[in-house]
Regions:
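Noncatalytic, helix-rich "gating/capping" subdomain that lines the substrate-entry/channel surface
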Residues: 74-363
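Surface-exposed patches in mature extracellular/periplasmic domains of secreted proteins
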Residues: 44-49, 78-84, 196-205, 376-390
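Bacterial Sec-dependent N-terminal signal peptides
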Residues: 1-13
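Contiguous, non-catalytic segments that form substrate-binding/exosite surfaces or channel walls
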Residues: 217, 355, 359-398
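Extended, non-catalytic structural segments that build the interaction scaffolds
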Residues: 16-27, 168-176
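Active-site-surrounding "flap" and adjacent substrate/cofactor-binding loops of secreted or lumenal enzymes
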Residues: 28-31, 36-100
Length: 398
């Protein structure tokens, strides 16, 4: 890496914007360029104990979160108009900060949801219920842009049912993945004990969850296979999907899900979705209820008592390596961003992003687009027609 300075007048010197403090110049850049360019980053900016990783981007995010924390703490400490955005944000923050109430309640707030699951009488009722709740038990359903026609949105159906995300965590015997798998098993047991089950009953629940998730993992696509866009795109009618999943009524499922006008879907991974449909339609009902119960319980842990939050943290340590829990106000901020992201964003903009800042950013973007247009004009290998199309695409940026 070479930096030049240029003299424009006798007294004016423009210098490079490169931060030499983070560079490790004792290393030959030809041997290890990453170490050479940023090897001293951890020395000048050590990783906080509550962070799983630390980069210049997470450093900026951390500074931004401190501003956001000050904003929300101020909102939460005042009387806000009932029904206002501020009132919603303040209520969520104060609820998370009320450790006495949360510890007294334990997992009681989630029990009514678990009771509804356990009251389901048959597989058809189970499918109808998970659709009405927009819950993805053995595959994922949602709306997004059509990968081959961004002008339209389409219902996407993808493989799912793996709480650990990757199939490798269930199937690989590599030391790192096995460590996570063993930690996950213990995490399930510990969580059910927090719910009030004894160790034997909790272990039985864990074995059921692992049986179903491992079965899904065996047919799920690997991370490498998921990178092939063509192999993960199968657009079809709902009738065609029904033929691929005998015994599973997609038309009714989509109506119950709230997508009653849907006639076409995009199925990313056909075989895992087929297995998920077969298991939901014809699988052991009690096993399905246990899996859904676990997914519901697991998703609630971060919102419950200190013991529940600590259990979640201890398990996640096996994957992310954070040495300490985040402060409660940071956890509250994270929950705000999960539940009320758009609201928090609006309040942040009102306080920290005035109109003149927006105008500056818009001017910067216009200058960038103009610069790119100049670069297009300078390309000798491009025909005039190609340049015209390139500029049309460029001018569509916003």
């Amino acid at each position: 890496m070479v930096a030049f300075t240029s003299c424009t007048t006798k007294n004016e010197v423009k210098s490079s914007g490169i931060n030499y403090d983070i560079m490790d110049t004792t290393v030959n850049p030809g041997d290890d360029f990453a170490q050479y360019a940023a090897g001293n980053w951890t020395k000048v900016s050590p990783k906080p104990a509550d962070q799983p990783n630390w980069t210049s981007f997470t450093s900026i995010s951390d500074k931004n979160n401190k501003l956001l924390g000050e904003l929300i703490q101020g909102i939460a400490s005042q009387q806000n108009e009932p029904g206002s955005l501020a009132q919603k944000v303040g209520d969520v923050y104060n609820m998370v900060m009320d450790s006495v109430r949360l510890n007294n309640e334990g997992l009681d707030p989630v029990r009514p949801y678990l009771d509804k699951i356990n009251a389901i009488a048959n597989n058809a009722e189970f499918i109808k219920y998970i659709a009405s709740q927009h819950d993805n038990v053995l595959f994922s359903v949602g709306v997004g842009a059509d990968a081959k026609d961004a002008r339209i949105n389409i219902v996407n159906v993808r493989q799912g049912g793996l709480s650990l995300g990757s199939r490798d965590y269930y199937l690989s015997d590599e030391a790192g993945t096995k460590k996570v798998r063993d930690a996950y098993k213990q995490h399930i047991v510990n969580s059910y004990i927090l719910l009030g089950l004894d160790e034997k009953a909790a272990t039985t629940k864990m074995e059921t969850v692992m049986k179903l998730e491992t079965e899904m993992a065996q047919i799920s696509k690997s991370r490498l296979e998921m990178r092939d866009p063509e192999a993960n795109y199968h657009k079809m009618s709902v009738d065609e999907l029904n033929k691929l999943t005998p015994g599973y009524d997609w038309k009714q499922y989509l109506v119950d899900f709230g997508y009653d006008q849907t006639t076409e879907v995009q199925v990313s991974q056909i075989e895992p979705v087929q297995l998920g449909c077969k298991m939901l339609a014809k699988g052991n009902l009690n096993d399905l209820k246990t899996l859904y119960e676990w997914q519901t319980l697991s998703s609630a842990l971060d919102y419950m008592s200190d013991a529940c939050v600590l259990e979640n943290f201890n398990f996640n340590q096996s994957r992310n390596g954070a040495a300490a829990q985040e402060a409660r106000w940071k956890r509250a901020l994270g929950i705000e961003n999960r539940l009320l992201a758009w609201v928090v964003g609006q309040l942040y903009v009102e306080k920290y992003f005035p109109a003149e800042n927006k105008a500056r950013m818009e001017e910067l973007c216009k200058n960038l687009i103009a610069s790119f247009a100049d670069r297009i004009d300078a390309q000798e290998w491009m025909s005039e027609e190609t340049k015209k199309v390139a500029k049309e695409k460029l001018n569509s940026f916003y």
